[in-house]
Amino acid sequence: MNAPIIDPLQGDFPEVIEEYLEHGVIKCVAFNHRGSLLAAGCADGGCVIWDFETRGIAKEIRDNDCSAAITSVSWSKYGHRLLVSAADKSLTLWDVSTGEKIARTILQQTPLQARLNPGLSSPSLCLACPLSSAPMIVDFDIDCTTLLPVSVPEMPDVLAPPQRSKCPESNPPFSPAAACFNKCGDLVYIGNSKGEILIVDYKSVRVLALVSASGAAPVKNIVFSRNGQYLLTNSHDRTIRIYENLLPAKNVLKSLEDLGKNIDGLDGIEKMKTVGSKCLTLFREFQDSVTKMHWKAPCFSGDGEWVVGGSACKGEHKIYIWDRAGHLVKILEGPKEALIDLAWHPVHPIIVSVSLAGLVYIWAKDYTENWSAFAPDFKELEENEEYVEREDEFDLIPETEKVKVLDVNEDEEVDIDTVEKDAFSDSDMSVEELRYLPAEPIPDTNDQQDNLVESIKLIEGQISASPASEEAGQNGHHASSPQAEEMGETRGKRKRKPSEKAMELQAEKAKPLKGSGKTVRAKNRAAFDQETDDSINGGDDDDDAYY
């Protein structure tokens, strides 16, 4: 849709269900960095990748060792790798282009969510949030996991050393913690069961700052906006909170260390809270004051202007959209099915939501065209009106009154090689990004080939039993006999229609004749045979053919 003919007063958010995608029972979805590919995890352990431009399946990925439901899918920054977590406690890293498995590891707990490091072009490092364990960093290259802290002890000097092992021991059950990377991938933000947000350096496994939230409710989800300027948390107190990120986009670790050095007279938790207040500040809170419902899979829009959250109530498929100022602007109501996951398109105002039945619904904007943008004097009519033209409206304009054509430099070279950078893209142009997958033809199986051979034999049998074949047999010539080939008759060819003269003679032959019928019948029979021979040998070129 061209931007000039879109009404600028309309909100840039989805409004109606445009289409739905179906492939087994879908459990989770994720867009790649450009939004050209949509990955989905299925209940049978497989993954499917749709080309979102054509809405066709581009690739299917399946691990023979996994038959459990997929819990999350995550793209690498440039789209070459896909991380899949499953209910059988496995993490699998895939090469999207070739469909080959790069690495696979088994955790001690079921990972509810796993995310690849967004700061690496070919990441082999991911952040996993297990069901009953602390968030951990998983390194596929060395097959090692590192548990991250989820709380700050009273005495920071007695911090326990980080637990690094190939098979970390399972900890006592506790409320699961949510975690995510920042935009550059050098810090991890963890929301714990106390409602606190910990800023952790995952390389040294140190807590650098602490942010306390009001209410002290456990944090269920935590996610950054695409530009890294805002942080969203979803808590058990049915409130979505938006924090503004005060740290710079680059050299984040150095900035945090400088903040800690500039604070004197404080130690321990108080110092971390002071540093945290200079890292994040509460910007807005969102909640339904009437129903007090829980929220499912909240996230930002691609440009960060909108906040979206799904209703966690059973039996309803509702999506709430707010602007950053905190105003509820739209409620999208879908089918009577619970919502389990959703994602906002990185570039376009499109939302995809997953229902409990396993369908993927695509929500898009209902555009109203504004054709007056092409001509300022364009007037939209509510109904048909009779137009009376002026007397000189279509008269030829004299040469002296013609508008002078603007001078255009036709010799100037037009740049057709430079690609304009997307407004929301932060990709490095030096690295080739995977935007589309080539179409792969599906080879015929042995069963399909056998069915094709049987179909051909069946058709040949029907042709051999056709009336034309029976007529040829009655005349003493088989359809494939040499005599039939000499006469120009072969199976599958068209048969000549007798001429009008032959038809008339045949009709006269059937009538009873008076007088000496033997002589007349002999003459008619000779003429009819001669005409029939001419027809068979192609004597009548103007006759029509029939099957």
UniProtKB/Swiss-Prot annotation:
Protein's UniProt keywords contain Cell wall biogenesis/degradation: no
One GO cellular component term noted in the UniProt record for this chain: Set1C/COMPASS complex
Cellular localisation: Nucleus
Amino acid composition bias (Acidic residues), ranges on this chain: 530-547
Keyword annotations: Nucleus, Repeat, WD repeat
Amino acid composition bias (Basic and acidic residues), ranges on this chain: 499-511
Residue ranges of the region described as Disordered: 466-547
Tissue note: Strongly expressed in root tips, shoot apices, vascular tissues, developing embryos and endosperms.
Phenotype upon gene inactivation: Eearly flowering. Significantly reduced trimethylated 'Lys-4' of histone H3 (H3K4me3) levels at the 5'-ends of WRKY70 and LTP7 genes leading to reduced transcript accumulation.
Oligomeric form and interacting partners: Part of a complex composed of TRO, RBL and WDR5A. Interacts with TRO and WDR5A, but not with WDR5B. This complex is formed during both vegetative and reproductive development.
Protein name, as recorded: Protein RBL
Gene designation: RBL
